[in-house]
């Protein structure tokens, strides 16, 4: 890995609103409407008032609204209550929770509890809200697990949708008492929240992609997102470290006019030129004979596509299959893109067959026992599985982040710097290892190659 750092340094050197009330609604659960249920009955079941239920679900206030079987209803907590790690409310009896568990309610705040805040669009009005609901549920599952180890938390969650003035949320009395906040989702909300966290010495975890450079000046920020430019640099450096001296690179033109990976392939070719590494160019439109002549018979070949999409990848697999049939002794590896994880259910055998490497910051391993266990708990707790639409899985992202940061705060308190060495936790999907940006905050520096080996096993090569 020492050479990886050398290559990375060399490359771097060379180169909609809701009302104010709705914006701060806090809710604790999501209820799936059953046949013949009424708004009154649901409110009574959870110990909330009908107006509180309506405020948490603005669609209910629209003229002509009818409660239908299968609708998802957001359940707020009553005003005198607070979230517990299991999503229940202090001072209120939740019939569903009572039926599931014999754990006693905690009427008073736990001593030395880590106070966790979540400020995200927690609603079911659009894709952003649904993703963040799943992410938040993952956080709750993590905090439940930590509770079994004696790590106590208090959770305060606010629905902060797009267009909301987050400063209104920050007026809530519990906000300034938090130890850590996860959020926001939208870039325009970052600065006021970051300034607030700095003023009250609260750790701020920005979990998803944002624009802006607040992390460069605010020491309370932990920014999970890495820029595309940074990830491209790391992907190129790891390619050079692993393949430059041992493999023959071949670039395949996929004729994809909407490709999103052109910057990577162009920059990689420039670096190979500077390093005086010979490579070949071919195309999916080439004849089999012309395609074959670009592959070296005396050393391994590494193939790079200029497209991240599934149809083009499938064409490449067909082309390589014909090549291997004609020249079975040819050694081939693929260097891909994290979008390929989405197609894993269809192409897994091909990934193994062609010794595939995928540069990424995460890997969703659905075959892992721990992953299966968490997915089963999620379904049991929330009555539905995690969405298959998202990779990385949103709930597992929330789970990993909560585990990492709460453990880090428990062990190190305010001195927690976000390094992997400070936290004894093996993530299910995403590793975290933060580095400081000057005198500002911290950015996740984790990077890995996920290697699908020809013996049908896998390895994570962490840089």
Label every model-predicted segment:
Residues 2-8, 23-52, 56-463:
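Extracytosolic ligand-binding ectodomains
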Residues 11-14:
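Short, linear, compositionally biased motifs with a strong N-terminal bias
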Residues 17-18:
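N-terminal signal peptide c-region/cleavage motif recognized by signal peptidases
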């Amino acid at each position: 890995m020492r050479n990886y750092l050398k290559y990375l340094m060399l490359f771097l050197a060379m180169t909609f609103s809701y009302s104010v009330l709705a914006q701060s609604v806090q809710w604790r659960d999501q209820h799936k409407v059953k046949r013949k249920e009424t708004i009154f009955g649901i409110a009574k079941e959870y110990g909330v008032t009908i107006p509180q239920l309506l405020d948490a679900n603005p669609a209910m206030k629209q003229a002509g609204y009818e409660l239908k079987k299968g609708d998802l209803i957001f359940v707020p907590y009553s005003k005198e209550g607070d979230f517990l790690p299991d999503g229940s409310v202090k001072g209120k009896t939740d019939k569903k929770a009572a039926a599931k568990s014999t754990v006693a309610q905690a009427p008073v705040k736990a001593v030395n509890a880590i106070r966790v805040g979540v400020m995200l669009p927690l609603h079911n009005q659009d894709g952003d809200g649904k993703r963040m609901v799943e992410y938040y549920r993952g956080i709750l599952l993590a905090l439940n697990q930590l509770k079994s180890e004696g790590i106590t938390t208090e959770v305060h969650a606010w629905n902060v949708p797009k267009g909301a003035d987050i400063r209104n949320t920050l007026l809530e009395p519990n906000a300034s008492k938090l130890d850590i906040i996860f959020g926001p989702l939208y870039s325009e909300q970052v600065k006021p929240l970051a300034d607030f966290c700095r003023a009250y010495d609260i750790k701020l975890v920005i979990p998803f992609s944002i624009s802006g450079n607040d992390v460069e000046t605010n020491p309370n920020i932990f920014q999970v997102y890495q820029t595309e430019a940074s990830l491209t640099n790391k992907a190129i450096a790891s390619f050079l470290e692993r393949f430059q001296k041992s493999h023959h690179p071949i670039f395949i033109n996929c004729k994809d006019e909407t490709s999103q990976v052109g910057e990577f392939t162009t920059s990689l070719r420039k670096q190979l030129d500077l390093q005086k590494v010979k490579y070949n160019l071919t195309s999916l439109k080439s004849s089999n004979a012309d395609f074959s002549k670009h592959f070296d018979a005396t050393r391994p070949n590494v193939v790079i596509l200029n497209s991240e999409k599934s149809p083009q990848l499938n064409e490449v697999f067909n082309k390589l299959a014909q090549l291997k049939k004609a020249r079975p002794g040819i050694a081939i590896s693929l260097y891909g893109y994290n979008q390929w994880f989405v197609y894993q259910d269809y192409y897994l055998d091909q990934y193994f067959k062609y010794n595939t490497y995928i540069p990424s910051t995460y890997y969703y391993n659905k075959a892992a026992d721990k992953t299966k266990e968490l997915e089963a708990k999620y379904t049991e707790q929330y009555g539905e599985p995690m969405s298959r639409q998202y990779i990385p899985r949103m709930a597992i992202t929330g789970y990993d982040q909560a585990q990492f940061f709460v453990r880090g705060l428990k062990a190190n308190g305010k001195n927690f710097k976000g390094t992997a060495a400070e936290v004894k936790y093996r993530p299910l999907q995403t590793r975290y290892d933060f580095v400081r940006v000057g005198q500002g905050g911290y950015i996740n520096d984790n990077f890995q190659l996920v290697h699908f080996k020809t013996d049908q096993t896998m390895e994570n090569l962490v840089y």
